[in-house]
Every structure is written in C-alpha cells, then in structure tokens.
Amino acid sequence: MDSVTFANELTALLAPFLASQKWYDAAPEPEVSIRRVDTLRDGWPSLLWVLVEVRGDRGAAAPRWYQLLLGADSEEPVELPPASRLGAMPTPRGPAWLFDALADEELALDFARVVDPDGTFAAVRALPGDHTFTSLVLDESYLLKVFRHVYDGPNPDVEITEALGRIGYQGVSAPVRVWSRATTDLAVMRRLERTRGTGRTLAIDSLRELFNSRRAPRDCKLDFAEEAENLGAEVARLHVALAEAFGADAADGAELARDMVAQLSRVAEGRLDTARIEANYARLAEAEDMGSSIRVHGSLGLDKSLRIRRSWMLVDFEGESGRPPGERRRPSSPLRDVAGMTRSFHHVATEALAE
C-alpha cells in the first residue's frame, strides 16, 4: 500500500473517532490531515504515534494539532469499549483493526516504557475525566499524563512545574520524565500523590452534610471553612513561587484589557454585542496601579487542587484550553487565578443546592 492510500484510509477512520472523544475540543465535523506516523512497536499488535492537523468547518477556524497513540491488530479488539475502536483498514499484511492504544493495557504499558525506558511497569489504569489529556496510573506509583491537543513550544503544565520544582516549591508535583519531540511536549510522568480528594469533592461533601443535617457549619465534621483558608494560603504561596521562578513586572492595564477583549471575542463568537463590556475593559488602561504581572495557573479552581497529607497541591497548569498557547504562557494578574477559584466555589454551591 502506498503512503497516499494509507493516509486516505486512516483519515477516513480518524475524523469520526476524533469527534466522539471527550478530550477532543475542536470542530464537530473536523477536516483531518495526517502530518506524521511513527511506529513505536511493530508486529501485532502494533503501536503507532500519529500527529494530525484538524481544521474547522470550511477551514475557517485556526488549525489544531492532536497526537494519537493507536493500536493496530489483526483481530477486532471486542474487549475494548466501542468509543475506543476506530474500525478496520486494509494493509499489506491483511486487515488491521485500529483502536486507542491507551485503552489497551498491553500497549499502554508499552507506551509508558517509551516515555521512561528504565521503567518496569506491570499495571496500568486510566483515570476518568473530561480533559484535553489522558491520565494513566502506573503501578499505583506514577501518573502519566498524555497531552492530546499539542502545539509547538513548551506545555505550561511541564514548564511551570519543572520551574517550581527547581526552586523547591512543594505545592506541585515536579516531573520525573518528560516525553517531547523537537520542541513539543507530548507527555509527562510524575509520582502519584496519595490524596483525600480534590477541593471540589471535599467542598461538595461539606455542603451536603450542612444542608442535610441543618446544623451550624462549625458543628459539621466535614466543614470546609478551615480547609478553604488553607487552600487560599497555598494559592498565595504559589503566586510568590511563580514570581520567584519567572519574575514579576508591573501590570500593564492596557495589555490586560486587550487580553480580556480577545478572550471575550472568542466566547461571544459574534453572537453578542460586546461593545459595552469592551468599553469597561478599556478603563483598565487608565488605572494607576494594577499590581504585579506574573505567570499564573490560568484555569485555577477547586478541581485543580488536591488535599494531600497536611497540605494542598495544585495541578493541571495547561491553562484554558480555548486560549492560544502564546496567551496561556503570557504573564497576567494573580487576581485571575483568585477569580477562577472564587467562581469555582460558586459552582460548587450551586451544584450542592440543586441536589
């Protein structure tokens, strides 16, 4: 089979598969172009690394890049969930059934050994969740995060946690392995932290007890007030550490306004008249003291915090998935993280009240 025929056969399977995945965050009817295919394991089953470019309807949206780890076998993998199976395509060796390799234990372990050639991993399980990445637990000791949406340049989740680890900040889990190609970060491995849960789960449990028992908050065993105060202190320590690791400058109100207008335009997508909101944003340019501008988490909330032992740990520093990579890495006001966390508390309260 020539390369053009192979690419056409694979592309026909990839478009519907991508659109059905929870981690996929681009156009619902993608135009897929295969940019690279590498074989990480030959034979049956094979392990393929595939880089694809995805464009939106009629090419209007900016292209996005996704990496796929695909398995190929001579028999249909009926034991895997339907959402993990792409279908069959012809090859010189006969029909090959394609599937998400990270859903298959054998191939997921093979890929983990690609990331860490010294690893002797024997067990793997996937973590649930609707993210732009896939997380695998290895031997209940390590966490392998595989980025699905990729782009040229460092991934903030790798860049920030590596930098914070170098200065000794304890509120993040520093990488032990990073798998990259050229200048693109593709996967990161960290030690698995033992936790009591995320801030979101602990806050919801606290509110459920409060609403059901009708006792004063201080009389509830799961009261989250003290934990919330400790979490706030950890966020403050994070910002101090980020300023130390990446530097701090006086915030530019005009630049912050431009950033907010750009984000507003993406959210509104021409469906709302944003003129009055933009006028309010423009007033930032006249502010005399906007505080400091530093690297920030970018999408902070209760679900991005883990309660460990006697402290809190903050995770998932990719930033907002809808923002271009350059914007995610741009310094901003630490109040952006504070606003994200505050909004998260509101969402949790609303969810608990609705139950």
Regions found by a protein language model. Give the residues of each.
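An alpha-helical support segment within catalytic cores of ATP-dependent transferases
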Residues: 119-123, 261-296
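Conserved ATP-binding subdomain of kinase catalytic cores across diverse folds
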Residues: 47, 54-265, 269, 309-311, ...
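Short amphipathic beta-strand and strand-loop transition segments with alternating hydrophobic
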Residues: 29-43, 49-53, 284
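Conserved protein kinase catalytic/activation segment
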Residues: 292, 296, 304-315
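Short secondary-structure junctions
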Residues: 26-39, 120-128
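Hydrophobic HxD+1 residue recognition
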Residues: 300
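Short Lys/Arg-enriched alpha/beta "domain-start" segment
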Residues: 1-34
